[in-house]
């Protein structure tokens, strides 16, 4: 079975992390998010994946230099201009004349993909959509269905309290070639807002399957941190990261590292290879990337430090992300979903709450912050 993963968006809501690393390659508990998706697809019988690329495509080819991940064969479809979700699917499936699975490149889920395919077959569907239930659907597209799962409407971002259902499009599809044929080539088209709604106006067989499987969109700082917490708490099953071993209940480590005898580490947590934890440091519900440092007296609470990141003496990171090679200076505090990009620095004694901190560079950074996403979904 073949699959397409949509990984071309710019990930604007996770800037400045995504200035240097595409969102699907950001780590979730010390493993690239996309690797977790590919592992899930392979587990359900997918043997070939087309990565639909737009933003920073070279990063993906560098990450998978031999075009393989385990037993999966990877192919790359690089757009020269944004084509939207449906346009990207059409472009990525050139030369494919069989059923494909499609998933968004920012969704972590335990969906039983085999069950979705069986649902699709049982109903003789042209397209089947995975639906997940949320408490407040006002930020999503909701999909009311008949009892057998036949889709009756698409309602985009309904006002609070008036949504016809709380079941939303969860971003995983099974599509037959007839659906791909409905998408015009080389045009910017949204499958959620154009292709699927248009199918309801024509003779078609469009269905949706509800599931209570774990599901999260990692596209905001809050959800990115939530995904780390959930993986640490074994929502995916098994160890939280490749090669991890349990040092004490809920505290995992990788490789060789140094933890001072006076340091305090509270589960759930994972410390990467080469990490250093100093005297009097405290780590609670957090992840340390490879080669990262939490210095003497520093506190890391419900936060993530990417590879080579550093908290200097008595620094604090609370509900925040310290990017690759970034530094929280001595006595400084990063809190309330502060995001520090690769190589960024928070000066000694400084305070940052809900901030976006990028490595110092020319004024282009401020211009980039104001530029909206184009084409691919974020």
Regions found by a protein language model. Give the residues of each.
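Glycine-rich phosphate-binding loop at the start of an alpha helix
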Residues: 35, 86, 90, 280, ...
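Glycine-rich hexapeptide-repeat left-handed beta-helix
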Residues: 287, 293-378
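A structural signal for short hydrophobic beta-strand segments in well-ordered beta-sheet cores
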Residues: 25, 142-145, 196, 208
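A short, conserved acidic/glycine-rich loop-to-beta-strand motif
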Residues: 123-133
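Extended, small-residue-rich solenoid/repeat segments and analogous flexible loops
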Residues: 187, 201-295, 299
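Catalytic-core segments of class I nucleotidyltransferases/pyrophosphorylases
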Residues: 100-101, 108, 114-121, 134-137, ...
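Conserved N-terminal catalytic core of the sugar/cofactor nucleotidyltransferase
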Residues: 1-5, 13, 19, 26-115, ...
